[in-house]
Amino acid sequence: MFTLKKPLLLLFFLGTISLSLCQEERDADEEEGEMIEEEVKRSLLGTVKDLLIGAGKSAAQSVLKGLSCKLSKDC
């Protein structure tokens, strides 16, 4: 019985270490994936923001042109 305890203890110890290393690597991969998702979200939000700003500028320009036309009565 004593002869089986040492190898089993060694296997348990090595298994625990390898499991711990795998868990650390998995956590690192998940953090990297979260960073990539944040970058994609930021780039999408930046693109949408730029489109909305451009649309707002063009709408404001057309409103101002219409107002200036009505005020100067050159329409």
Curated annotation (Swiss-Prot):
Expressed by the skin glands. Keywords: Amphibian defense peptide, Antibiotic, Antimicrobial, Cleavage on pair of basic residues, Cytolysis, Disulfide bond, Fungicide, Hemolysis, Secreted, Signal. Residues 23-40 form a propeptide. Disulfide bonds join C69-C75. Residues 1-22 form the signal peptide. The keyword Signal applies. It is found in: Secreted. One of its GO terms (biological process) is defense response to Gram-negative bacterium. InterPro entries: Antimicrobial_frog_2, Frog_antimicrobial_propeptide. It comes from the Eukaryota. Pfam families: Antimicrobial_2 (PF08023), FSAP_sig_propep (PF03032). GO terms for cellular component: extracellular region. The keyword Disulfide bond applies. Belongs to the frog skin active peptide (FSAP) family. Brevinin subfamily. Has antimicrobial activity against some Gram-positive bacteria and fungi but has no activity against a range of Gram-negative bacteria except P.faecalis. Has antimicrobial activity against the Gram-positive bacteria S.aureus ATCC 25923 (MIC=19 uM), B.licheniformis X39 (MIC=37.5 uM) and R.rhodochrous X15 (MIC=9.5 uM), is virtually inactive against E.faecium 091299 (MIC=150 uM) and S.carnosus KHS (MIC=150 uM) and inactive against E.faecalis 981. Active against the Gram-negative bacterium P.faecalis X29 (MIC=9.5 uM) and is inactive against E.coli, P.aeruginosa and S.typhi. This is Brevinin-2HS2A. It comes from Odorrana hainanensis.
